[in-house]
Amino acid sequence: MTIYLVRHGKDDDTFRGGWSNHGLLPIGIKQVYALAKEIAITNIHVDCIYSSDIQRAAEMAEILSNCLGCPIEYVPKLREVDNGILAGMENNLADERYPGLYWSTLDYDECYTNGESPEMFYNRIKAAWLGLKNRRLKQTTKDALLVTHGGVIEAILCVENNVLFSNKTRHFSAPNAKLIPIEIS
């Protein structure tokens, strides 16, 4: 069985992401339709789409669900990092109000104000991912799709490849609207 990880389509990067609720840009929507076409052409069959409930991922999941004819299950625990007060803030305003505050500048156990730390994020994603994998293995042998975020995919790939997760270094690439297959057994 395969679970295909996919990062949401292009969103507006002039805002801080995290738990923001900005949707996809028009180019991001085009990326989603192109991915749906690619899935159909390559004869990939999924019986379920799991998705973060944050707007940019949920919007992608809804389009894919309509194109592929399969249900969506929203998984809030597979959201991007909770960046607290920075969520959805314009980058220039965030830089002005909170100079030098970035994901990569946090200590591993340091939380965003009203948010979570890299350690909390990784532990949340690891637990949610392992739970989803175990549930799939018990219920079905069919493939599935997980629509989520770059940071979530990074954490999952660290789990799957036994790589030490860090907010200081990115180990894997997760381009917008590209499938990343994970074989589950």
Question: PLM features: residue spans?
Answer:
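Domain-level recognition of soluble alpha/beta enzyme cores
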Residues: 161-185
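Phosphate-handling substructures
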Residues: 66-126
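Glycine-rich phosphate-binding loop signature in dinucleotide/nucleotide-binding domains
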Residues: 42-45, 132-142
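Active-site-proximal alpha-helix that buttresses catalytic centers in soluble enzyme cores
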Residues: 3-71, 116
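Generic beta-sheet signal
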Residues: 3, 140-150
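General small-molecule cofactor/ligand-binding pocket signal
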Residues: 4, 73-75, 183
